[in-house]
Structures are given as C-alpha cells and as structure tokens.
Amino acid sequence: MPPNTVNKAAEIPPFEPIAIVGIGIRGPGGINSLTTLWDTLVERKSHCFPLAKDPRFQRRFNPDDFKALFDGIPDSENVLHANLFDETPGLDRTYFSLSEREAAGMDVQQKLLLHVAHEALEDAGYSGAEDGSAFDPSTFGVYVATATDEVIQDPRDYDTDIYHLVRTERAFLSGQICFHFGLRGPSSSVDTVCSGSITAINDACRALATGDCRAAIAGGVHVVTPVSGPISFYCIKRAGFLDRTGQCKPFLQNGTGYSRSEGCGLVVMKRLSDAIREGDRIHGVIRGLCIRSMASPKFISQPNGAFQSVALAQAVKISGVDPAAISFVEAHGPGTAKGDLAEVSSLCSVLAQHRAVDNPLTVGSLKGNVGHAEAASGTHSLAKVIAMFQRRRIPPQADFHPSRLNPTLQPFFDKHPIRIIENEEDWNASHRIAVVGNFGASGNAGFMVIEEGSTFQPLEGRDVPKVSSPLPFVISAKDQATLVKLIHLYIDWLKQPSTFLTPLSDISYAMTARRFIHPFMISVQADSHMDLVQKLQERPPMINGSANRTPREVAFCFSGQGGERVDPRDSTLYNFSASFTDAVDMCFRVAESENLVAEEDVAILELFALEFGLVEMWKSWGIKPVALAGHSFGEYVALVCAGVLTVRDALKLLGIRAALIRAMCLDVPGKMAAVRLPLSDVNKCLEQQKSTRVELACVNSDNSVTVAGTPEDLESFRQELLKWYPAASWHLLNNMTAAFHSRFVQPILADFTNACNEVKVHPSEMVVLSGLLGKMCPVGDAVLQQHDYLVRHCRETNRFGTAISDYQRQNVERETPQPDWLEIGSHSRIISFITPASDQLKLPSHGKSAGEGWMTALDALMRLYSAGHVVDFKDVHYDVNPSAHHTDLPLYPFQLEPHFYPARREVKASSTMLASTNEVQFCPRVPSTELAPLLLNHVMAGYTLCPATTHVALMMAAASTFASSSQQEGRLAYKLSKLKVIAGFTNTTDGWLQVRRQSSTSDLEIISNDDNKIHITARAEVCKEQDLLESLSLYASFILPFKSFKFLPSTDVLRKELAYSLFNHTVNYGPHGQVLDRVWIAEDGYQAWGYSTYPGGASTAEGVPSALRDFSPMLIESVCQLIGFLMNTSTNRKDGEAFVTDELGDCSIAISKLYETKYVEIYASYKMVDGGTAGLGNVFAFDDKGQLISAFRDVRMAKMKIYVLKRLIDRGRKPEQVVTTQHVASTEVEEDNVAHNDIDDKVISVLKAALRLSEIPLDKTLGELGLDSLTAIDVGVQLERLVPHRRDHLTIDPEGNLTSLLQLLRPTPLPKSLPITSSTKESKVETVDLATSPSLPIMPNGVPTTVNGVPKPNALPTVNGLHKPNGAPAANGVPTANGVPTADGTSTEPSQTLVANISPEMLQAISSNPEVIQYAPGRTPLLLIHDGGGTSFAYYSLGNLDRTVIGIHCPGLQEGKGIESVHHAANEYANIARQYLKQQCPGHSKVLIGGWSLGGTISMMMAALFPDLVAGVVTIDTTPPGVVGLTAQQAESVLLHPWSRTDGIHGLVRRQLQLNTRASFAHPEYKTIIRVTAVNVPVYVLCAIDPFRPSESLDLPKETYQWLLSFKQSDVAEVTWKELIGERLLGVQSVPGNHWTMFTPANVKATTEALKQGLDVIEARLNKMG
C-alpha cells in the first residue's frame, strides 16, 4: 500500500451543521408543546400512575389480559405503573381526507405521527410550495423510529382486512407522512428500540449533508396499545427493566429500573446555511452526532461505559466544540444502577476532565417527570434542551436531593466538577451548548452535540419595514367551522403581551408565506397588532374555494397619457418595494446617461418608469401576465414587456417623438375629446358632419371613443352630437400634448420614421393586443416587428377596445377562461373600458397620488390572491420586507376522534349485554292511545309523529326488562348503540308499538301494527350507573372549555318563546315538548349550550305511558333536543328544508340522575357531512352538580325538502332511500337481464362487505361511501373473479356511483332499465315495466312520481305529458280559465283562482328553482329548461342519464307570468345556471343545456349568448326558426286546441302557454342572433317521428299543416339547423311519438335513449376538441 494512503480513512470528515427549524411534541399528562413540557419540568410533575387503579387503564386495556400474564409474579401491582396519555391519540380524519374505514384501519401511531408532523411542519413554516427552496417537497425526507406495533403480526388473532399490511408494517409510519404531506424525498422507518429517535435524526443529518435531501423531518413515536401492551409489559418486566416502585428515578439510590411512557416527537431540519438564507427561526443547531453499538461483551442490553466514552468523544470531535464549552447534558438516565453508572462515567471521562471548578457540567434527565418513552425518548430529551435554549434556564431534576444520590455515583461527583440541580436556575453561558444522550436495549446508542439557535439568528438590530403601512395577513382552514375557531385563536394570541414583542412584519410573513393554504380562508390588511385584532373581530368576508383550484390568469393593460402625473420616486412603493425601486432607477439611469428624454418631457419618463416599475414588481410577486394591452402611449411599455423593444430603445423613441411634437405640433390647433356613446352612433355623426373634419382618434370600447379636431370643429360636432343623443357624455382633454392618432401629428411622421428605422425590433415573447390593428397578436407575430408599426401607431386610429373584444372573442372560441385585468398606471380609467365576464376582476395597481401606491397595490394583490391567483408571498416579503423571519403562530385546531383497532377475541370486561336467550322476546305492546299525548307534543310537517326519544325510552325500558337478575342490582344506566331510524310512526286510533329482541343478541327492534314494520333498531346494554358516569366524565374536560363562548358578545342568546318560534318551521312542540328554557348559539353556528329546568318540574310524568314511568320520553328529550334545534336554526338549512333524525348513533343515559337533578345544562355541536346533505353531531348533558349524565354521540340528521318529508311520512318510508337488488326493466324478461341481475346482486354484496354498509345509497359516490385506494384494489380483485369478461376494462372510479359501476361490469350494454330504490329489507329480483307496472308510482296522467327512487312532488302534471279524461294525449296547452288569456286574444290579469286549488306540495315544487331531477356527480351537469307550459315536470319521467340533471321552471309560473322574451329568459337562466354551478358543482364551469319545445329555443339562445357557460345543446322537438309560419294567434290555436281542463295547476300552465307563445312571436330576433353569432358549441337535435293529427280542422297556413302532418320533420329540421349553425350540428335523431307524446310512458324510454346518445356524442366531440 502506498505510504500516502495509510490511515486516510481514519480522518473525520467535517460535519455539516444542521439547523432544527421546527418541532412537534406529545407526552403524557397533556404535554403537547414546549410550553406544557416546560411546565411539567419546572413544577416537578410526575405523570406516572398505577395501571390497576386508574380509570384510564380500564378504558384502554382489558384487565384480564394483564391478570393472566402477571398472576403470581411478585410486585406485579407496583410494576404496573406507566406514564400514559390521558386519552387515546385521536385522528382528524376529515382533515386528512380519510374514509371511516381507512381511518379505522390505521395504526394509532400513524395517526399520532400525522398530527405531530403537521405541528412540526407548521412550527417550521412549511407551506408545501414547490418553490425551489430547501423546503421544496420534492427534496424533503422523512425518518421515523418506532419499537412497537399496535397489532401483533399474527393475523389469526385479529380481524384482518386490506389494511392489515398498512397497520403492521413499520414502513408505513414514514410512508403515511410522505403521502399525506406530499413529501417526495427519502423515506425510512427505523427500529433501534429506545435509541430510535436519535438514530432517525442521525440518518436525516447524513442525508442532508450528502444532498440526498434538502430538508427532513425526523423523530420517534411510541404508544402502548391494548393489543401489544400486556405482552410487552410482561416481557420488559421479565427482562428486569421495570422499576419496582413506579416512576423512573435517574441517578437516585432507590432506582431499580424505568417506568414506561408514551410520546411522539418530530423535528424539522435543514442545513444551517439554508436556514439562515431562507429566514427560518432556528431552535438549535446540531454540531455533531455519533451513533455506535455499545453493548457489553457479556450481555447485549448491559451498558458499557468505556464504549459510551468512545462514542461521546467522537461526537464532540466531529462538532469541533471545546468539551469545556458544553455546559449541560440531557442524559439518557433510565434510572437503572448499571445504566446510570456507565453513563456518568463516560460523561466525566470526556467532558469533565481538566474542567474548571467554576464551570461545572450540569446533568439532568426528564425521565423522572415523564418516564421512558422508548422509541420517542430521544426527541423528548431534545425537546427539553430546545425549551431550555428558548428560556435560557435549567429546570430542576425531579425528586432530586443530594442525599438521595446513588452511592455508586458519588465518587464521580466528588472528583469532577459535575452536578445535578434541585432548583431551577439561569443558564449562564456565553454560548449554550448541550449534549443529548439516547441509548437502546439492543446496544445501539448515540450522542448529539447541539448549540442554541439564537447565535445564528440575532433579534437585536434587525431592519423593520421602511414605511409604516398595512401588511397582508391570511388565515385558512379545511372547513368553515374550523376557520372560525382558528380566527378566535389568533385573536386571543395577538392580545397576549408576549405577542406584542414579535414584529408585525414577522407575523405577516409567517401567516402568508409559511402556512399551509386550505380551501376556506380570510385575508386582511393591518398596520399594527391591535389593528389586526380589530380586523379579525370584524369578521372579514370568508373565501370558500378549493386549495387546489385551477389558478386564474391575469392580463396587464397599460395606461396612456392624460392621467394624473405621479413621479414614481415619490411613490410609497419606491420606499417599500425593492423590485419597483430597481426598475424605476434603471429607467432614469438609462434616460439620463444618454439624454434620451429632454427635461421638458420628463413627465413621459416618469409615466414610463412608473409603469415599467409596476410590471417588474408584479412579476417579482408571482403575478405574471398572459397578455399585454397598451392604450396609446401605454403600448410602448407593453412592447418592452413583450420583448419587442428594449427599455433604452423605447425611451429613445418616446424622447424623439416628444421633441418632434414640441418642435412641429405646438402651433397646430389640434385637441382631443372623450365621448361616452356607442361607436356606431358616433360613426353616424361623423358621417353626417364630414365638414367639421373631426376624426375618430381612439376606440376605447363599444361605448366610448376619443375624437380629435380643431377646437371650433370639436365644439360644432359636440353641439350636433348632443342634439342627436342628449344623453351622450362629452369631456374635452386639455392635458394632452398633442392630438395623437389624427392628422395633427402628420408633421412629425417623416422624422419619426427615420428614428424607428434605427431601432432594432425583436419577436414578441408574449401575446400583445395591438391598438393599431384592433386585434390580438400571438407570440412572435411579425407585424409587431415592422419598422413603420410605431409610425402608424402614432397617426392612425387607436383601436384599443376593438383589440380587447377580439381577444375576448378568441378566448371564447378556444374555450379559454377570460383573464382578470390589472391596470398598469396611475389610475383605473383604462380598465373601465373593458367589459368583464361575470366573475372577472378589474383592478388598479397604483393610486392617483404617490401616497396611494402601496395601499392600492396591496389591495389588488390580496384580491387577486383571494380570487385564486398564485401569489408567491415569500417573494413578496423578500421584495418589501427582506428582514422578516418566521415566528410562532397558533397551531391548527384539529377535531380528533379516538380509536384503537380491536382484537377479534371478545374483551372480558364487566358484562353489560342483556341476559342470554335463544328465543325471540317481546315487550308488551304500547297502544297509540297511550302514546297520543307524546305525539301531540311533536308535530312535524303537519303530522303527529312519534319522537325519536320515545323510541329511546321504549328500548331502555325493554333493556331493563330483558336484563338478568344480577344485572338489575344497584343503580343502573343504559346504553344504546348503532341506533338507526328506519321509518316514522304516526298516530293511529288502533295502532301500537312493541319492542322485539332477536334471539341470542342484544339487538332490539321497535315494530308496529303496520304489518310488523320495523321503525327503529339498536343494540342495548345495561351497566352500573357509576361505571357509566366514570366513562362519561372523560368527555367533560373536553366540553367544559367551550362553555366560555356563552359569555362572548357575539353569542346569540335565545329565550324559550323566541327559540321555539324559530323551531316551528320544522317541529311544532306542544307545551310539554318545549323543554329548553334558554339557548346560547356560538358565533360559528356549529355549537350551542342549552339550559332546561324540565327535569326538575312536576310535569315529567304527565302523559307518559305506564310502561315508561321510569323512562320519561320528554325527560330524555330535554337532554338531546338541542342538537336538532341547532341544526334546524342554522344557515345550513334553507327555507322549505328540515334536518330530520336519521341515526342516533350511540346513546348513554344515567336515567336516575336525570330524574333527580333540578336542571340540566346541555352542550351540542355538529359538522356537515356527505357533501352538505346531512349533519353529524354530539349532545351532552350535565346535571345540577356539574356531572355529565348523558351523551348522544354521532347523531345524524338528514337534510330534505319539507314536501318530500311529508310524502315519506304518508308512505311510511325511511327518509334515506337505499338501493337493493331490485331493478326496473322490461316486463318481458330476457336472458341477459337475468344475467345482469345476477351480476348486480354479487357486485352489491361485495361492495356492502368491503364498505361495511347494510345498504348502498344511490345518491352518493363510491368515494363518499368509503371507497379509498386500498379498498378499491380489494374490491377490484374480488370483482375480477366475478366478471372475467371485463378484466381488461376494470377501473373502479371513486367518483362514480353504484349505477355507473354496474353499467361497467355488465356483460352487455346497459339494458333499457333503471335502478330504483327500495326500503325493503328483502333482496328480490323483479322486473317492472316503466309504463304499466303498479310497482312504480304512477300519477293519474301516467308520469312516474319517482326517478331513480327519488320521490317527486305529488300530482306533478307536465303540459306535454298530461292525459285527457278519455285517455287521448293532451296537447301542449290548456283551455281557457277564468282570468286567463283566451285564444281570441283577450286577456285579463291572473286571478287567485289559478292557485286556489293547487296543493301546498305542488306550490312548493314549482317554487323550487332550479330543481335537481337526477343526481350523479362527476360528468358535466345537464340543465333542462321548461317547455312552453313553464314547468320542467316532463323531465321527471326520463330514465337514468348518468349525470346530474337540473330542471328550470319558469320563474313567473306561480304568479301567472311568462317569459318576457327568449333573449331575456336566456339571460335570466344563465344567471341561475352560474349560481348553481358555483354553489353545488364547484368542479364544473360549464353545463350541457337543452329543453323540449320552447326550452330548446331558449337553450339555443343561451348557447349563442353565453359560450363561456354552455358546453353543448340538445333540443327536443324544437321547431327551427322560420320553418312554421304562424302568427301568435294561430300558434295559440294549435297549442290550446286539445285541452279541456281549467282548474289549479292547469290554469297556471295554460297561462304560461299563451304568454310564452306571444313572447316568442313578439321578439323575432332569435333567428338573427343564432345566425349572426354562429353558435359555437356542439348541438344535437331530437325530433318526433310521428305527425300530429288534430281531431278537427284548424285554420292554419298550408306550410304549417305540411310541417305538422309530415313524417319528414327530422329532414327539414336537419337542413334548417345546418343552414343556421353549420358543422356544429352533430346529428338529428328521430324519436317515436308526436310532439305531445314524446314523454308518455309508451315513448319515454326511446326519448331517454336518444337524449343520452346525444349527450354522449356531444361529450365525445368536446373531448376530441380538448
């Protein structure tokens, strides 16, 4: 070996200093932050408790599991101590977008890691932005340590499923963090037992040093779980590690082992250089780290002091730190005699040798406070040191006194300057440097040298913003309720005195640039801490959008001359924005260095520099334009931004042009004037007044122009103009240097041409809207490179407005969203010329004065951000506030749900199930006559309906009856679980209710006289009252803090009278039903407190059946009614809707306590679920002693229309419609349909089992039902075995519903049938004819009253589907009614008789606008517009279209008013469609539209007028314009001919027919608009194939009869529509029936198929177009 290579490997490479920039911590005793950890340390708290005697142990573990293992082991009771969490670690599954099944399948340690990782990332200021910084998610690593599993990896002992692998494989610990936070760097899960944390951190440091990642999150987790806990305790005890008396006792003489603990700790790290550069707050800096195996040669787990010394010396050497500079050691300190001895000896040998007496080494260990958290212990120790750095204090060692020191350690303390302190003291050191030790039982151990971070982040002497102006602030959350809570957290935090010490600029930086962005947000601007508090208290508008919404785009328009003059060097932006300042300085430097602009023309330089500076500022903030439009002078700056001209050349040309104007045009008497009048009108006047020689100088917009001429000519023109158009606006522009864009600049053109020829012009790099050409010029357009372009631009008319219109038109044609507009200049005059789309922004970027610069720009920035533009707030702050650093902010308020994955074996806890029996048991029947007083106190939707609390009382009484004699001893309490409402029970004279118990179970059902119909089901349990009260007490600590909002001024306080007046729209409560005396509703509307003295009153027994004398239903009502009140008085309920109890979830009541208390205080809270269609909440009640005595958890209330609820009660059906294996098909059952039903049954069975559902609702997507990625794989494997013919196609879409999945899996195309819903429990296969079967609800007129199982309003007549009494098909109209227009043209005002006989349900139905007819999210929604009769009821009979279908009634239907015109209706319905998309379909920006007859006409008009909204059109037998030559009176004759009824709804419909017919004929612009605009969306036409044969001759034109009687309508329609819209017509399809019979039962199937085919053809074309 060559000499120069010897021992090179022994050299220690330099250690890259690693900054800890974020931390998240969890520990026993409620430790959830550095603050709570510090409180534990300085107050000498111990969180150890004996397992056997603590209720927390009883809640989590099965005592019998411990008893079986430890029976006979000495000191087992003392050994079984631990430092456990107060509550099971929970999960906010909604925040992490997890299904219930997926959340249930996760290891509890994974759940804990997700939340602690979120807090560590928030603490570090990680926002998830892919910005190329060290925090870019693509280079972010994850390193996690653990030592235990929640479930032992033997699947025989557990209920294994698709998630078993996820639960048991430790790799998923780090993988879950990567997945949920989108981190794509290295990922690793390690296990070195107790030293896991420091090992994980070491791995992360090495990866950072080598460049494998640029940021990392690392640490450990440990939770003692019900499954693994007993056996792990037993094994550790047998190994001799557990202390015989309880808590860890580091360094003490009575220490015999350690006490187990739980915890989690994660730190976020970067290279120190990156952290300093990126403005991070640095908690500490890791200077050196060494991991070694230190096992004794004799025994793997026996510590070895000599080996530890080697590792510690190596860590110190790597750090480059003088050992004497290390002043504190956070020792591993397990409290074992050998372990403490080995560790202290190593510390003395490395750190205490040659140490001065006045520089003692302080040693401590937090295990005396929190125990040993095993794999998480290292991060616990690290967190303690960081807390010490922040406070510059050293906490006392728990339970320490010099007299208690372990005698074996005394020689080391006598010989070396080393100490343990018993009182808190200052940490006095010039540089605070510490060592953290962390050892593992496997022999793996490590030491870390860490230095305080303040050394690298000095707070003193920092720069502050140069001007005292407002700064931006943003708060966001995943949902509205959480956002409100977070706002209050910020308000409380900002009021704290310590927060006032934090610079406002740091707070702004942290809130905008260093936080996750969520869908619900607010943004404000404030210039002080208290101003920010005030702005937040004022409840700024909430933005509801998607965090992943499609980014919006912006276009810049540049101001011309003539506005307010602003010197950019005087602007507040010049002192605030570095990018603005640099750009402005560059312009002045270039101009002045070459004398490009004369002093007399400095205003031009100022305007140019201002606009160029604004552009550079916006670009530096991440706002980059997609198009540039300059108005006159402004086009020079636009060309510079587009790369056509350089700054120098643009200034040179502007300087030359200005000099030429001064030299040649000052004596030319040209002036300019602005005219507010349509361009066409101005052109007419110019044509008439040619003699005045007034010229059109600028086309600003369609309604604004600028003209030029001599003063005399302009005055003459003005006078003549105002004669013609008195309303025209005229404004003389006196501040212009010349009359540009007119003959008055002709003298300068020759010289200016020479100047332009000398300038080098480059291809454009951006879209430019040319004012010269009046059109959009794409990137690289050669016309902009012509040297005479700017010469012509100076002389010819500037067509700015025409260019804008051309750009907007091309965006429509390309189906490109219109951008927002930002004016670059000192005013907002130019953007006023732009006509925006409905939601387009038009914003100025600078005020009219220099002092308004920053305020205007900031306001525009925040409005752009709120609208969805991508703003790089890091760059914003770097530009305006480069000294800003990240700082502490309130953490996100998660809504946690506890859960441990259960073992399959039964838990042998104290039995609460009912006595065993092998027979079905019944309680005595309770007749409805006894229930009547209860029902009369509960009237819903006009019906006396049995309240759910009566069912609860019946079941509790039954549980008491069925309980065994041993269970009935002492004071009892009752639990009901899985409590579901199946159907309501209404008062009948001979009715009854009865509780039935299934054999060998605790399952109870309430049945009634209605053929033993089941009304409600639940599982019942009986338990000791004291046991129940102890378990309920756990919730009290979480609930009581919310009591504070009762005293806030923003809380609504309602007394009984007002409360029940608000509640009456849903439920009318009788005197005994009004159990709430007072209600406090929180500001967020999602939580409330109630107060009730009903339990203490004498009325609790009044009207109660004898069977329920010990279980008063109204007494139970007093503790749960609040949840229904809260939901039904919230903003989530609209008029005509109600929240109705669907499931009561789990109910626990100490009934005796409820009878004894004088009053109850009730707390209720809820959240919206299932896409806003239901509320899910909890309600708890406290007695007069403050004890929690009842709980209703997971109460689900479905939201529905009142009229639907009424019909459901009528039919005795459950509110939620669920699917069974029942199908609507042809009465002639074919073999393929039998095959379909067989496959359907199997598919539904697989889904039910996989999703753990008893039924599959049709109105929810599979994703909403819990079909996540892993479940989809599981289901897919099973389905491939069932349907091998579809293996190559099988992709299960979570966005689809059951119908779409069945269609995918059937072996042949979907048959001509539709799935309907049923509430029956039996699974039958039936085939039902759509038209004739009585199983499908049919109206008297033959139109189904349900579609896809969704009930439609009773007696829903459709004009085109009604039948006359003799069975002949009705015409599209109704006969004359009193007060209704007649066929002869006479008319009167609508009479009250028109609505007198219409049912409330029908009035409710026609007032619901728009109406959801079918619901199937995913594909583009279909909007169907009413026919000539004004209703959309015809569309209810359509079959399944596999998409959401929305119907629009005529808004004036109920008032007897028709449409004003086709044009007006198109505008009105477009607004309805936009609002529906925004509120209900945020993922869609367009709709497919269509309609029958008049509905098709309006649809075509909408397509012509609103191509940004309409994706395609399907017309249903709509007559092409100009084909049928009828007068309005003749049209009425045809439409009204077959009708003979005049009552009720028919009168309204008849009036609609007549009014709408006249409106259509009175406004013949329809054909012209269709032809001129050339409808630019795909169109598909359906035509009736049969002719119309009236029963008598009508006086009609010949061509009309030919159309009505011909079989060739489709041919004529195709030719006519083709002539009008050309290639956009994709097809014309004939449909059986004539115009008036297309939706009758005989023809509706064919109409459905044709409509569906047309929609598919349109979507295929749209997909092809991209």
UniProtKB/Swiss-Prot annotation:
**UniProt-annotated stretches for the region Malonyl-CoA:ACP transacylase (MAT) domain:** 555-863
Specify the enzyme's EC class, one word.
transferase
Domain Ketosynthase family 3 (KS3) as annotated: residue spans: 15-452
- List the CDD domains hit by this protein, alphabetically: PKS (cd00833)
Per the UniProt entry, the Enzyme Commission number(s) are 2.3.1.-
Q: Which SUPFAM superfamilies does the record associate with it? A: ACP-like (SSF47336), alpha/beta-Hydrolases (SSF53474), FabD/lysophospholipase-like (SSF52151), Probable ACP-binding domain of malonyl-CoA ACP transacylase (SSF55048), Thiolase-like (SSF53901)
- What InterPro entries does this protein map onto? AB_hydrolase_1, AB_hydrolase_fold, Ac_transferase_dom_sf, ACP-like_sf, Acyl_transferase_dom, Acyl_Trfase/lysoPLipase, Ketoacyl_synth_C, Ketoacyl_synth_N
What are the residue boundaries of the PKS/mFAS DH domain, all occurrences included? Answer: 905-1206
Query: Which residue intervals make up region (C-terminal hotdog fold)?
Result: 1050-1206
Q: Which GO terms describe its molecular function?
A: fatty acid synthase activity
Kindly give the Gene3D superfamilies that the UniProt entry links to this protein: 3.30.70.3290, 3.40.47.10, alpha/beta hydrolase, Malonyl-Coenzyme A Acyl Carrier Protein, domain 2, Polyketide synthase dehydratase
Q: Name one GO biological process term.
A: fatty acid biosynthetic process
Tell me the segments the record calls region Proline-rich linker region: 1334-1397
List every stretch annotated N-terminal hotdog fold: 905-1034
Spell out the catalytic residues. Answer: C194 (for beta-ketoacyl synthase activity), H332 (for beta-ketoacyl synthase activity), H372 (for beta-ketoacyl synthase activity), S632 (for acyl/malonyl transferase activity)
Q: What is known of its domains?
A: Multidomain protein; including a ketosynthase (KS) that catalyzes repeated decarboxylative condensation to elongate the polyketide backbone; a malonyl-CoA:ACP transacylase (MAT) that selects and transfers the extender unit malonyl-CoA; a product template (PT) domain that controls the immediate cyclization regioselectivity of the reactive polyketide backbone; an acyl-carrier protein (ACP) that serves as the tether of the growing and completed polyketide via its phosphopantetheinyl arm; and an alpha/beta hydrolase superfamily-type thioesterase (TE) domain. An extraordinary feature of PKS4 is a repetitive proline-rich region (9-20% proline residues) between the ACP and TE domains.
Protein function:
Non-reducing polyketide synthase that synthesizes the universal anthraquinone precursor atrochrysone carboxylic acid from malonyl-CoA. Produces a mixture of both 3R and 3S enantiomers with an excess of the 3S form. PKS4 catalyzes both hepta- and octaketide synthesis and also yields 6-hydroxymusizin, probably via carboxylating activity inherent to the KS domain.
Can you say what this protein is called? Atrochrysone carboxylic acid synthase PKS4
